[in-house]
Regions:
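Short secondary-structure boundary/capping segments
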Residues: 306-309, 345-347, 389-398, 612-613
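Conserved adenosine/adenylate-binding substructure
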Residues: 43, 55-58, 73, 122-129, ...
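Adenosyl-5′-phosphate
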Residues: 1-4, 8, 22-23, 71, ...
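A mobile, often basic/glycine-rich helix-loop segment
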Residues: 385-409
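Generic hydrophobic alpha-helical membrane-span motif
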Residues: 38, 148-151, 272-275, 384, ...
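Hydrophobic (often cysteine-bearing) scaffold residues that line and stabilize catalytic clefts
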Residues: 17, 82, 99-102, 121, ...
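Cysteine-centered catalytic environments shared across enzyme families
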Residues: 1-343, 348, 361, 517-518, ...
Length: 613
């Protein structure tokens, strides 16, 4: 994986602006510590930071190639998993390659098929190509949004970058937030409306979208979405197809010129990836697979079971490691480190995030990076197979089901800001927009249509939030993380599997569990879903409480501008006792809300944000 950034201005020669591009590129250093390069020509500049994974010597970027006497230059962040298939097809069409990188194959794919090349790609990507022949920039983002791509139009300039910080490094861009951005932070955070960059004037290319910038202006279009069709396969055929698509996705994503490991929590998703990878390693005669798990200091003493998190991971991790002969690394984070990484997690994300759910992952990825460059992880399984508790609720609630306690959260704001931001209406409008966009089948029942809406909401919102988290925290550690469940072929197929198949045996993700019979140990295969682990230690609550109190001692804290002092004091004094049910997702309760508010302060202070009312 890498960091990319660029600047196009048809009204201004950019050959003397290389120092600006160097600053923009340097902000992405953690995404690519292995190499730095700047490329420029006339009215375009590209910057690239590389994390070398495939074709260490031959994959340097930005990369320029010539085809039919025209030059094309690419800067690319991602990984293609059908590189060799594309290479063979392109060679048949007369293309010659200098190395074996996927970057070169992607560039030649554009040279051959132009914008239509994106339909042929299997992978995770965000890339930009300068097409000298047509004097335009083409950019695209992968179908599920695993890799990020932000952009901004500033006068006659068009800017893009893997992260917001690259765009903010440009002298024409100011860190400003208007009412819409504030509504994103206080109403939807830590999620974001698809395409919204929160900072005024900064947007994000939505998953499955592409863009073209030329002298005629900016054009953006959607090139992919799930398609609703009748599922005609029998249950047994469905199980077989799910198994094949999943195993093929994992196997394709094990290709690397550097060592690969897996995350292992003992849940069915990470265990399925680990089992498939371990079998492949054994078949290829490779050394045993290394697996990694995270736990918290004194967790065995303070762990508290709940409907969201019924049990700790340890016993299931041990069963998996023993069953597949992995070399397991049990990483234990202290409460001190957990709290200490909260502020940095904001900078890595460029936004207030998921509190210790972020900071623990940032620390964990750095532990993995000590020995590995690439890891596979189980994100997206619950969104596509229906694993979350809200998929199984009988309540037909209008609104995002992973966002609870909205009244209480909004109530923390001062009355004037509650009136200005009108958060209930803002959040509901975003919900309705997504529901209206859901691909439906006319002949489906009302219940079936509602299920599609729920899956679509999860795919566009909750899944994207978790993919953002995984990308920023892993790249903040210079670790590449791949997500087999985001293989678009698997997502497209599972989208149309009927609910009674998905719930086979009256178990969440039943069809996927059936596909894994004989592969996973039964104890792991039928373990009730448990989310990413979290701390229950009172020392963490005390630490974030003291942190927020210290920030509030600063008279110029942005929190004083927005929050009701009495209610904020009460939140701190009670250690968030009124938020016993997770207010976001499955993990974020009172202590996480306290930490999240401290992250909001850190964001305003670090980025020196101007507020436009």
């Amino acid at each position: 994986m890498c960091g990319i950034t660029g600047w196009v201005d048809f009204k201004k020669p950019l050959v003397r602006e290389q120092s600006v591009m160097e600053k923009m590129t340097e902000t992405l250093s953690k995404r690519g510590p292995d190499d730095t390069n700047i490329w420029g020509k006339h009215h375009v500049l590209f910057g690239h930071k590389r994390l070398a994974v495939v074709d260490i010597e031959g994959g340097r970027q930005p990369m320029t190639r010539t085809h039919q006497e025209s030059c094309y230059t690419i800067c690319y962040n991602g990984e293609l998993y059908n590189t060799e298939d594309l290479r063979k097809e392109l060679q048949k069409r007369g293309h010659q390659f200098k190395g074996h990188s996927d970057t070169e194959v992607l560039l030649h794919s554009y040279m051959e098929w132009k914008e239509e090349c994106i339909h042929r790609l299997n992978g995770i990507f965000a890339f930009a190509v300068w097409d000298e022949e047509r004097d335009l920039l083409f950019a695209a983002r992968d179908r599920l949004g695993v890799k990020p791509l932000f952009y901004s139009e500033q006068g006659t300039s068009f800017l893009f970058g893997s992260e917001i910080k690259a765009i903010l490094a440009h002298p024409e861009v100011k860190a400003r937030v208007d009412r819409q951005g504030l509504a994103e932070i206080f109403g939807l955070g830590p999620s974001r409306t698809p395409g919204n960059g929160v900072f005024k004037g900064i947007k994000e290319v939505r998953p499955g979208h592409a863009m073209r910038f030329s002298k005629d202006g900016l054009t953006i279009w959607r090139y992919w979405n799930v398609k609703s069709e009748e599922h005609t396969d029998s249950f047994d055929e469905t199980v077989e197809n799910v198994r094949f698509l999943f195993e093929d996705a994992v196997t394709r994503q094990l290709v690397s010129d550097v060592p690969v490991c897996t995350f292992l929590s003992g849940g069915v998703d990470s265990s399925a990836i680990t089992a498939t990878a371990a079998k492949h390693f054994e078949k290829e005669g490779k050394a045993p697979l290394h697996t990694f798990s995270i736990d918290y200091e004194d967790n065995e003493q303070y762990f508290t079971s709940s409907s969201f998190q019924p049990n700790a991971d340890g016993p299931w991790i041990k069963k998996m490691s023993e069953a597949f002969g992995t070399v397991h690394h049990h990483c234990v984070i202290s409460q001190k480190d957990l709290a200490a990484h909260l502020a940095e997690a904001v900078i890595v994300r460029d936004l207030p995030g998921m509190a210790d759910v972020d900071s623990s992952l940032l620390w964990f990825c750095r532990e993995i990076k000590k020995d590995f460059v690439v890891s596979l992880s189980g994100e997206c399984a619950d969104e596509i197979f229906g694993g979350y508790p809200w998929f199984h609720s009988t309540e037909d609630v209008k609104g995002f089901p992973w966002m609870r306690s909205m009244e209480e959260r909004i109530g923390l704001l001062q009355d004037t800001w509650q009136e200005k931001l009108n958060l209930k209406e803002y959040v509901m409008s975003k919900y309705e927009e997504t529901v209206h966009e859901t691909p439906l089948l006319d002949r489906e029942t009302g219940e079936e249509k509602r299920r599609r809406e729920l899956f679509y909401l999860n795919m566009l919102w909750f899944m994207t939030t978790l993919l953002d988290r995984k990308d920023r925290m892993s790249m903040g550690a210079s670790l590449e993380v791949r997500v087999p469940f985001a293989d678009h072929r698997l997502v497209e197929y599972v989208w149309n599997i009927p609910w009674d198949f998905k719930m086979h045996g009256n178990r969440e993700k039943g069809v996927f569990r059936k596909a894994l019979e004989g592969i996973l140990p039964n104890e792991v295969l039928y373990r009730k879903k448990s989310p990413y682990p979290k701390t229950h230690h009172p020392a963490y609550t005390k630490a974030v409480k003291q942190w927020l109190e210290s920030l509030l001692n600063q008279k110029d804290s942005a929190l004083h501008v927005f929050l009701d002092k009495k209610k904020l004091d009460q939140l701190i004094e009670t250690e968030g006792a009124s938020f016993q049910v997770p207010w976001y997702g499955q993990l974020m309760k009172g202590p996480q809300l306290i930490a999240h508010l401290a992250q909001i302060h850190t964001w305003f202070e670090t980025y020196r944000i101007d507020i436009e009312e």
